[in-house]
Amino acid sequence: RLRLLNAGPSRFYEFYLVNSANVVQPFTYIANDGNLLPAPLLNQTRVRLGVAERGDIVVDFSRFALNTELYLVNRLTQTSTRGPGAVQAPGTRVMKIVVNRNPPVADVSRVPTALRAIRRPTAAEIAAAPVRRWVFSRRNGFWSINDKLINVNSAAARIELGGAEIWDLDNPSGGWAHPVHIH
């Protein structure tokens, strides 16, 4: 299991796992910012991460011969802080993995078919849910939400445990690509 985290302030990445000939190798995608997915996504070839996003992947290294070299590469171009550009191969190598079997015992672990149950709201709950609008803007080099700068000591919203709301996130700030993380 590899946890990939984009800890940068403005860069997007699109990661691929490739061998030394730049042939893409599949993996299983099991988690993102919201923790475990309901079920694993099998045979994935890429994971895109925005600012402060994470993705957990599982690679079955038993498929590879001892001393095989694999690389995590970024193929997403980005030349400005406003957002990503095109996907271009072969990409930039970010991490090298050399397959080793130490200790030399068989790994019998398996990714389960169900990772976690997620209770989905009913149509009636969605229809009755209150709507909050969050407008993101950027001025004088700072981001604001609903015309307010962030206050880390105050929650902007409080929702009853088990409650549901619809949040409308609007970023009319002229081409800035920026993921939103709700904590």
Annotate each predicted stretch with a short phrase.
Residues R1-A114:
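Histidine- and aromatic-rich segments of cupredoxin/plastocyanin-like copper-binding domains
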Residues R1-N19, E53-L76, R119-R138, V152-I182:
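Beta-strand cores of secreted/periplasmic/IMS beta-sandwich domains, seen most often
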Residues A39-N43, K148-A155:
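Active-site-adjacent structural elements in folded domains
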Residues K96-N140:
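Extracellular/periplasmic ectodomains of large secreted or surface enzymes and adhesion receptors
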Residues F142, N146-D147:
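Eukaryotic Cys/His-coordinated zinc-binding finger proteins
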